[in-house]
Amino acid sequence: MATDRRRVLPVLLLVAVVAGGLAAIPRQDDYAGARRRMIEEIRARRDVTDPAVLAALEAVPRHLFVPEKERRNSYEDRPLSIGLGQTISQPYMVALMTSLLGVHRGQRVLEIGTGSGYQAAVLSRMGVEVYSIEIVKRLGERARRTLSEQGYHKVHLRIGDGYEGWPSAAPFDGIIVTAAPPRIPDPLLSQLKTGARMVIPVGNSYQDLWVLTRRRDGGFDRRRVLPVLFVPMTGEAQKRER
């Protein structure tokens, strides 16, 4: 069947223009592919195998938790600046710490150091109720806005010093700390349920990631996981070091 070339040519030109414009703009599908590649890289390291953790990381749009200028790098396995001297942890570290926490749907977790809100979003995606504290007001307000816009309504965010934890909401099924104090804050230990874990980086120039599990007798089993580098915990933690 013959075709009128005069009608086809404008259509082809329009398609070419639209396609050319879209090529310059990252699409949601592009980010989805980048997330899948990020998950494949994490799986390849073989120390994060929890399907719920990996599914949450694949579902949460990390690019929406970083500044616009960092979005092209948002699924690379490295920390990124979120401004005000703070960073968003590398995806592998988020996966590892979440896996070490060992929490499940319906449980409650205290997070010290909301930052961008990404770690809280991952936990919320797993069905965990999150209580998160951020000491930097502007970061906390930005994270609250992002979490609300993305529909993460099981995150309770408070702006303040996280050293004392959140006593009125304690005890928790897990505590995750995303800034390094010189030593482990005793108030946080007291807010763990029996059998619950705290995952925390500890140290000054040299830091290690630790997992502490509360025993029935009130003591703690302590396990050092690996050397890490986190931003320091500010506020009361720094005052007590002087």
Model-identified regions with their sequence ranges:
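Positively charged
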Residues: G174, K239-R242
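Conserved nucleotide-cofactor-binding alpha/beta core module
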Residues: G102-D221
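Generic hydrophobic-segment detector
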Residues: P10-V11, Y75, L96, I133, ...
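Class I SAM-dependent transferase core
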Residues: L22-L110, A121-V122, M126, L139-E141, ...
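N-terminal secretory signal peptides that target proteins for export/translocation
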Residues: M1-D4
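Bacterial Sec-dependent signal peptides at the C-terminal "C-region" and cleavage site
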Residues: R7-D29
